[in-house]
């Protein structure tokens, strides 16, 4: 990821929730949409609400510290994704899950999951609800739509291929 994108990617691309009860109520009202979570704390919070994500992407860490979480009844798929990068193999795994509508999956990332919101937006359906953590602020909830896809594609085009 180019350093020039750090500030851009640290902005929330959706509604920032700081209150768990309001987040829960919002999600209950959107129960017909596919829900995709990116991050360990976000995923654990959603599961605490007895809401099961269609896809959860986690790395076993919170703020770079290891956490021991039990995410329950999911099929676990291990992928590798180094910090600051998005591996093509990981993009393909996310695409396969989202395009083929394969729910109840957890991508367990060896590395870092933060940037994987990007392929989730690109390959997700219009209307998917994507939830990710905003460090030291709360939880961002965004509804996948044409504007978001275009904006994320613009950002993704600025990434550089480092190896093949």
UniProtKB/Swiss-Prot annotation:
Chain's role: Catalyzes the GTP-dependent phosphorylation of the 3'-hydroxyl group of dephosphocoenzyme A to form coenzyme A (CoA).
Residue positions binding GTP: 40-42, 59, 61, 113
UniProt-listed Enzyme Commission number(s): 2.7.1.237
Reaction(s) catalysed by this chain's protein: 3'-dephospho-CoA + GTP = GDP + CoA + H(+)
One GO BP annotation of this record: coenzyme A biosynthetic process
Keywords assigned: Coenzyme A biosynthesis, GTP-binding, Kinase, Nucleotide-binding, Transferase
KW Kinase (keyword) present: yes
Biological or metabolic pathway of the protein: Cofactor biosynthesis; coenzyme A biosynthesis
Keyword check for Zinc: no
Cystine residue pairs: none
GO molecular function: GTP binding; kinase activity
Protein name per its UniProtKB record: GTP-dependent dephospho-CoA kinase
Position of the signal peptide: none
EC main group: transferase
Family: Belongs to the GTP-dependent DPCK family.
């Amino acid at each position: 990821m180019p350093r020039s994108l750090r500030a851009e990617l640290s902005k929330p691309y959706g509604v920032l929730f700081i209150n768990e009860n309001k987040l829960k109520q919002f999600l209950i009202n959107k129960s017909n949409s596919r829900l995709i979570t990116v991050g360990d704390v976000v995923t654990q919070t959603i599961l605490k609400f007895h809401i099961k994500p269609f896809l959860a992407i986690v790395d076993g860490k919170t703020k770079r510290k290891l956490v021991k979480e039990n995410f329950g009844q999911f099929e676990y798929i291990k992928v590798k994704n180094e910090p600051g990068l998005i591996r093509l193999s990981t993009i393909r795994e996310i695409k396969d899950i989202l395009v083929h509508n394969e729910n109840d999956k957890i991508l367990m990332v060896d590395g870092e999951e933060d940037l994987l919101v990007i392929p989730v937006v690109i390959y997700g359906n219009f209307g998917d609800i994507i939830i990710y953590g905003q460090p030291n602020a709360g939880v961002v909830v965004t509804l996948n739509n044409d504007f978001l896809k275009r904006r994320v594609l613009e950002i993704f085009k600025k990434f550089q291929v480092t190896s093949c």
